[in-house]
Amino acid sequence: MIAIHDIKKHYVMGDTVIRALNGVTLDINRNEYVALMGPSGSGKSTLMNILGCLDTPTSGTYTLNNTEVAQMSDDELAEVRNKEIGFIFQTFNLLPRLTAWENVAMPLVYAGKKRQTRYDIAMQMLEAVGLGDRANHKPNELSGGQRQRIAIARALVNSPSIILADEPTGNLDTKTSIEIMQILDDIHRKGNTVIMVTHEEDIAHYAHRLVRLRDGILESDTVNKPTQMQK
C-alpha cells in the first residue's frame, strides 16, 4: 500500500541546510498499525506530512496504492487527501463556528455530497464515536476528549483506507487518552491502516509495529510483542 524509498527532505534556512529526512526507506502494508516515534527534530512529523501528501520530498520516491505520488496532478492529490486518507490532529483543527456534525461533514462538502446526505453520514460517524447527542454543540461547548472524538469522526467520514494520527492524545488526560486509543484500536480492527505519531511509549504500544526515527534517519523498525500492547 505505502512504499517510500530513500526519501530526503531538506530545508534551506539562510546559509544552513536542515536535513529533516535523510534517506528513509519504509514499506507499510494494508491494515498495519504503525507508531512513529522519535525525539523532537527526528523527522517524524515531516515524514507524516509526506505520507499524507501535505508535503513533497526533496528526493526519493513515494508510492501509494501502486501509484507514484510525484506523478499525481494537484486534483488527484486533493482527491487522495479527501477520500483515501483521514487525518487526526493533536489540536483537533475544528472550525469554531460550526456544530459537531457540520465539522464532521466538511470532507463531504468537498466530495460534493448533498446536505441531507452529509447530515446522515455525519450522524452515523458521531454515533460511532459516542457523540450522537452532541451533534449540535459547537467545539467550545465540548471537552478536549469530545473534540478529539469529533476529529476522529471527521477523519472517518469518507471511509478512507488510511488513518494518519499526529499525537492524537497529546492534549488529553490519561483516562481520555485510553478512550481515544480504544477507538483507534476499533478502527484498525475494521480494516483500516493506522499510522500514528506519538512521543509516549505507552501509547506507541497500542500499535503492532514501532518505527523510531532519529536525526532524519530510520533508527529501528520492530514488531510490538502482544504482552507489550495495552488493551
Question: Where does each model-flagged region fall?
Answer:
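Conserved beta-strand-loop-alpha-helix hinge in the C-terminal portion
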Residues: 209, 217-231
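ABC family nucleotide-binding domain
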Residues: 1-213
